[in-house]
Amino acid sequence: MSENQNPPPSPEEIEAAMSANAADELNRLQGELAELKAKSADLADQFLRAKAEAENARRRAEDEVAKARKFGIESFAESLLPVCDSLDAALAIENATAEQLREGSDATLRQLMSALERNKVVIVNPEAGTKFDPHQHQAISMVPADQEANTVVSVLQKGYLIFDRVLRPALVTVAAPK
């Protein structure tokens, strides 16, 4: 035997070494577990905060929409108040002449048209000969006419658009095919 050879470890030494390794491994795993638990708790907290923030944002958005619906017409209503004032003033006159009534009605109509225009309401009043547009016109009847077929002959009632969306189509008569 050479001097460099160590005697084989005894079973007790092997068991002690394994116990020491197991204890070290257990300590390492317990430390890792504690670290992961802390990270998990932190992530759970972050999740709950994010969830609460999302819920608050949703609630704020719902409140904003409710307020917009409730007060969205406020500007439009304010623009109609001068029209109401003019009508009240006209009704207060007891002995108005037909000419005064006509002038007052014209002025009130101009106020109303101005209020509609300020609120982006546009009149649809096609001229005779305009091509019939089913998106903006509603044909009430077709009549024989000396113009191209499917064109407007006359307007029975004006239509209105708001931001290119039809509020009411113009009621028109349309030239029948020849």
UniProtKB/Swiss-Prot annotation:
The lineage of its organism: Bacteria, Pseudomonadati, Pseudomonadota, Betaproteobacteria, Burkholderiales. This is Protein GrpE. GO terms for molecular function: adenyl-nucleotide exchange factor activity; protein homodimerization activity; protein-folding chaperone binding; unfolded protein binding. InterPro entries: GrpE, GrpE_coiled_coil, GrpE_head. Its main location: cytoplasm. GO terms for cellular component: cytosol. Belongs to the GrpE family. It comes from the Bacteria. The keyword Plastid does not apply. Homodimer. SUPFAM superfamilies: Coiled-coil domain of nucleotide exchange factor GrpE, Head domain of nucleotide exchange factor GrpE. Disulfide bonds: none annotated. PROSITE patterns: GRPE. Residues 1-11 have a biased composition (Pro residues). NCBIfam families: PRK14139.1 (NF010737), PRK14140.1 (NF010738). PANTHER family: GRPE PROTEIN, GRPE PROTEIN HOMOLOG, MITOCHONDRIAL.
